[in-house]
């Protein structure tokens, strides 16, 4: 490169000994992510992309692309603004029942990093319904901190990606099980857990790579979905791509007592075009919508083939 780095303008890697080398790893990790998104649509192209990138991706948490925030406005964690308002003046931020039940069933050691306890337990509310705020877990203080960083790409995601690439038959370093174990361990430690807790967790038959499921997409997809907590768009993409964990559509959801579920609802798999596109570019918007099967939240993107 023409220079050793971008100096203090580089908010991700300026503190590293070799910032450009870190950016190269970030670029390759991003290629791995994009290659996997293509894998069911175009396996040959995905294989080429992933095998070219796999040898120089993230190798530890030190490589994380972590965007820093400060304690000073306006440069603080944007989640903290809403979160702290919710904790003081609003009562509509609680943990969802599905993720709480899933993590409770697995005795997941990341729960203290994700959520608060209520009466000595982690309790989730019904998503989208009226819930009594005091009776359910809320987000952990760590997430609501003004200086809690935003992960753009992290080591666990990369390790899960390498595990999947190996299971797909692509040539990457290491074994799928090694990468899976590395990913789960790193995720647990990031959220405040220990190596010992990770080892105990990975020894569970419902977590272990070889016994949790015969379907690698379920094994990797479930744990990757949990590891992507607080990264909604990426976890949504992974769920659409791998179809795990198995989420119930709203029409099949169980409602709290005295409430009901509207009929005909499904889980969105895309965002519709914004209203200004419909208003200012109506003809082309209609043309594009027709080409993809309709401007609907149920229209799958081109790579979502399963």
What is the predicted function of each stretch?
Residues 188-306:
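C-terminal functional modules
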Residues 1-193, 210-217:
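Structured, solvent-exposed acidic/aromatic patches
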